[in-house]
Curated annotation (Swiss-Prot):
Zn(2+) binds at C101, C117, C124. Catalyzes the hydrolysis of the adenine ring of phosphoribosyl-AMP. The lineage of its organism: Bacteria, Bacillati, Actinomycetota, Actinomycetes, Micrococcales. GO terms for molecular function: magnesium ion binding; phosphoribosyl-AMP cyclohydrolase activity; zinc ion binding. Homodimer. It comes from the Bacteria. GO terms for cellular component: cytoplasm. Mg(2+) binds at D100, D102, D104. It catalyses: 1-(5-phospho-beta-D-ribosyl)-5'-AMP + H2O = 1-(5-phospho-beta-D-ribosyl)-5-[(5-phospho-beta-D-ribosylamino)methylideneamino]imidazole-4-carboxamide. Residues 1-23 are annotated as: Disordered. Pathway: Amino-acid biosynthesis; L-histidine biosynthesis; L-histidine from 5-phospho-alpha-D-ribose 1-diphosphate: step 3/9. The gene is hisI. Belongs to the PRA-CH family. This is Phosphoribosyl-AMP cyclohydrolase.
């Protein structure tokens, strides 16, 4: 189920080494992409700090996200772009984009409308907590 139809996707691996990256040079050069040319994108609700989901972006998806006000991901399984909410109505409006200290993960802060998860839940991290030994400060 593709949430965005135009334009046809370029394989992410091609974009990672493309000197004509749509991103400003200082951003493109700071990204540490995986072997497929992708960077993890953690999506967080801007006003509550709730972690909503994890998606993947290549240079083009990040460019679209930074210039449209809506979050676009690159689907690893379908190898195409999809903009969150185009078919479901569960839109993610961009509030900020940050790169982590290693350059291999993005934090996309959004205003989420409706469910963030494809299962229909607010967050993709609902109800799957593991039992752990918790640590305490001494």
């Amino acid at each position: 189920m593709s949430e965005q139809s135009a334009p046809s996707p370029t394989p992410a691996a091609e974009l990672s080494s493309d000197p004509a990256s749509p991103l400003p040079q200082e951003i493109a050069s700071a990204l540490k992409r995986d072997s497929s040319g992708l960077v993890a994108a953690i999506v967080q609700q801007h006003d509550t700090n709730e972690v909503l989901m994890l998606g993947w972006m290549d240079d083009e998806a990040l460019h679209r996200t930074m210039t449209s006000g809506r979050v676009t991901f690159y689907s690893r399984s379908r190898q195409e772009y999809w903009r969150k909410g185009d078919t479901s109505g569960h839109v993610q409006f961009v509030k900020s984009v940050a790169l982590d200290c290693d350059g291999d993960a993005l934090l996309i802060r959004v205003d989420q409308i409706g469910a963030a998860c494809h299962t229909g839940t607010r967050t993709c991290f609902d109800g799957r907590d593991f039992t752990v030994v918790t640590g305490h400060r001494e």
